Amino acid sequence: MERQLDAYCAHLRNERQVSPHTLEAYRRDLNKVLAYCEKQQISSWKALDIQSLRSLIARLHQAGQSSRSLSRLLSAVRGLYHYLNREGLCDHDPANGLSPPKGERRLPKTLDTDRALQLLDGAVEDDFLAHRDQAILELFYSSGLRLSELTGLNLDQLDLADGLVQVLGKGSKTRVLPVGRKAREALQLWLPLRLLTNPADDAVFVSQQGRRLGPRAIQVRVKAAGERELGQNLHPHMLRHSFASHMLESSQDLRAVQELLGHSDIKTTQIYTHLDFQHLATVYDSAHPRAKRIKGGDS
């Protein structure tokens, strides 16, 4: 079973060209299924049936796994069985018809506009790490990049003269995004410093040894910036969520935000309308005289 799982992961990496981050998440989920099969003495993927998979989902849910995590696991299983069926190694899909237990819809965490400006407008020290990290933060917030898109960014994808960046998104789909003035300025300060490392390839963001920064290194630097400037936990996707929320709040153009984010399904983008409504409700509660009267206890 593990050999076939290895072959599937190689297929995802080489033929489907999924990002390392996505591949790691799929492998982690499928390893849970593999461990369950070994424990239940299920000796092949062909022998795993819908009842056994349903039992695993129930156990993981009882152990605290979120509905979203279980949905991703089922998606990984469906992908595996699609591959196994295509290769003639199986003739069924135990995940067919299964859905995870429903859970509360969690809204993405964002920074409000003031907090985003507080993060980005602080004084930047004149050194390698400070200029690099500032360029990373500005680009995340300016263009709404995914972590995998930023780590994979090469010099030939940047056009600072026209203020554009071309990124390779999920499913190897490319899209061209605007780069704001502040992000362009930060990149123009960073790129000459990058050359001092004699970089090994064309990566935009490199370490002091000239090697491309990986996802974990960028997560660590973003987290450090959040703790230093805001006193809170911060991760790259929070900057992407903030970009989306602030763009939608200003433009009210859901389709445009969908294109900028690279979402194939507008339903994925619609979650930001809930954030926008949440903001409007807060403004209403604080500003509308009738809302204030209700809060004051008048009837």
UniProtKB/Swiss-Prot annotation:
One GO location term (cellular component): cytoplasm
Location relative to the cell: Cytoplasm
Active-site residues, as the UniProt record annotates them: 146, 170, 237, 240, 263, 272 (o-(3'-phospho-dna)-tyrosine intermediate)
Signal peptide (UniProt feature, chain positions): none
Domain Tyr recombinase: start-end pairs: 106-285
Cited Pfam families: Phage_int_SAM_1, Phage_integrase
GO molecular function: DNA binding; tyrosine-based site-specific recombinase activity
Domain Core-binding (CB): 1-85
Keyword terms: Cell cycle, Cell division, Chromosome partition, Cytoplasm, DNA integration, DNA recombination, DNA-binding
Top-rank taxon, per record: Bacteria
GO biological process: cell division; chromosome segregation; DNA transposition
PROSITE patterns in alphabetical order: CB, TYR_RECOMBINASE
Primary location: cytoplasm
Biological role stated in the UniProt entry: Site-specific tyrosine recombinase, which acts by catalyzing the cutting and rejoining of the recombining DNA molecules. The XerC-XerD complex is essential to convert dimers of the bacterial chromosome into monomers to permit their segregation at cell division. It also contributes to the segregational stability of plasmids.
Oligomer status and interactors: Forms a cyclic heterotetrameric complex composed of two molecules of XerC and two molecules of XerD.
Similarity comment: family membership: Belongs to the 'phage' integrase family. XerC subfamily.
Stated name of the protein: Tyrosine recombinase XerC
